[in-house]
Structures are given as structure tokens and as C-alpha cells.
């Protein structure tokens, strides 16, 4: 596996771990990694989103 691929895999794992921590706090927020733009997208309660992520989710 290339260094870049390994880095993406590590980031995906980190996001998954963070999502698990959030789920335990019952925030109902799900994180997943989208490959096309390499963006972290947050799905869940809109009131829990930071302004930066809210801007990213507007299409």
C-alpha cells in the first residue's frame, strides 16, 4: 500500500473512533469519509454542526 493510501486509511480509522465516542454521548452524529473530494462529512442533528461544516454541507 502506498504512503498516501495508508494515510487515508489512518484518517478513516480516526474518524470512526471519534464517531464512536460521539455516539456514546448520544449526540446522534455520524461521521464518514467521502473519497471523491477527501472531505469529512458530518451527518446528524444540524444544531450540533459547527459553522464550518454547515457551510460545507450546503450544495
Curated annotation (Swiss-Prot):
Location in the cell: Secreted
Record's keyword terms, sorted: Amidation, Cleavage on pair of basic residues, Neurotoxin, Secreted, Signal, Toxin
Organism domain of life: Eukaryota
Segment forming the signal sequence: 1-19
Major location (coarse): secreted
Keyword Signal: yes
Tissue spec: Expressed by the venom duct.
SS bond list: none
Signal among keywords: yes
Propeptide stretch(es), residue numbers: 20-25, 45-59
Gene Ontology MF, one: toxin activity
Coiled coil: none
GO-annotated cellular components: extracellular region
Isoleucine amide: residues carrying this PTM: 43
Functional description taken from the UniProt entry: Neurotoxin that is active on vertebrates. When tested at high doses (10 uM), the toxin affects all zebrafish and mouse DRG neurons in culture, which could be an indication of an effect on a widely expressed receptor or ion channel found in both species. At low doses (1 uM), the effects of the toxin are confined to a specific subpopulation of zebrafish and mouse DRG neurons. In vivo, it induces long-lasting dramatic alterations in the locomotor behavior of zebrafish larvae. It rapidly induces hypoactivity and death of larvae at high doses and it causes hyperactivity at lower doses.
Miscellaneous: The mature peptide does not contain cysteine residue.
Similarity section: Belongs to the FARP (FMRFamide related peptide) family.
Protein name in the entry: Conorfamide-Ep1
Naturally occurring in which organism (per UniProt): Conus episcopatus
